[in-house]
From Swiss-Prot:
It is found in: Secreted. This is FMRFamide-like neuropeptide AF7. GO terms for biological process: neuropeptide signaling pathway. It comes from Ascaris suum. GO terms for cellular component: extracellular region. Keywords: Amidation, Neuropeptide, Secreted. Its main location: secreted. Belongs to the FARP (FMRFamide related peptide) family.
Length: 8
């Protein structure tokens, strides 16, 4: 669970 924009 990192930044919202990194959801691959």
């Amino acid at each position: 669970a990192g930044p919202r924009f990194i959801r691959f």
